[in-house]
Amino acid sequence: MTKYLELIKKEIDETELSVVSKKVIKSTINKIQKFNEEQYKNPNDLIKIIKTFLKNNENLNTSHTFIAHIKSILKHTSLKDMISEIDQNEIEKLFLKYKNLKERKDDAEEPSKKHQENYIPYEELVKKYKQVKDKLNWKDKLIYGLYVLQPPLRADYGDVKLILDSDETDYSDINENYFLLGESKMIINQYKSNKVMNKEGEFIHKPLIFMVDEDVYDLIYDSVKLGIEEFGEMRTYLIEDRFGKKMKPNTLSKNITRISMLLFGKAIGIQEIRTIYCSRFQLQDEDCSIETILEDAGKMGHSISVHIKKYMKRYVKPK
């Protein structure tokens, strides 16, 4: 790989780019040269290096600058003749992705006065809940745990059917949501943004499917066990109201706010818990991880644009 990169450096020197531009672009080439020569031997391996660098880098500005320089190298040197069209297209996609993220860097909004007053850092929400959860009744313990221990932190948990034996039960109806007890798997079919556009321009169904972590599974399992002891049979839905019906989003939201008042003396609702979670990292922070933001948006079931514009707030964090 080194001989190809040295050739590209010479070609950069021969361009009409400014002295500063030449210097910073060659600095990016130096970063590429630091990767294992035995593992990455020729230009066809460049895309692997690019993806590895972007994956491991935590800083948005650095990532954007890096991929922008690669794009500039493609434009001004023979690199475009050394790598495949597929890789060139992949580089273009990566450039557009990081360009879009950088342009949105300052889009995060200030929280409302109410949201700021109710703000508690996410890690403190989790810590406090874990400290006092055993003092809550099993239903409150379950409801709040679902919303602070693991994303997607949605208002759709009241409409989730409990499935004891997934091998013998049909759970293919996309109009229903399911939790498979035997597999620790949550399948959320019905939620606000469950339609995405495919390459043909058609909207298709996109379920949220994820494994719950051990803490959440234990909460659900214990609640099922206690529910059977209390009512003599397993309930139908993950969260039910006092009439044994699935809990409606509005009722669920009121319960979350009520439990927040018990725990923190603040009326923190579902929407605020979502924004607190999504704002763990600030776009303005130097150590903001782009991959984490992309991962968070995917888990929450909304677009990157919605994630940044609606849910990432510039909270004033307590000292």
What does each model-identified segment do?
Residues 143-147, 275-287:
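Short, amphipathic alpha-helical "recognition" segments used to contact nucleic acids or chromatin
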Residues 283-287, 293, 298-319:
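Catalytic-site neighborhood detector that most strongly recognizes the C-terminal catalytic loop/helix
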Residues 83-130:
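Flexible interdomain linker/hinge and immediately adjacent N-terminus
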Residues 202-267, 271-273, 277, 282:
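Active-site/catalytic core of tyrosine-dependent DNA strand-transfer enzymes
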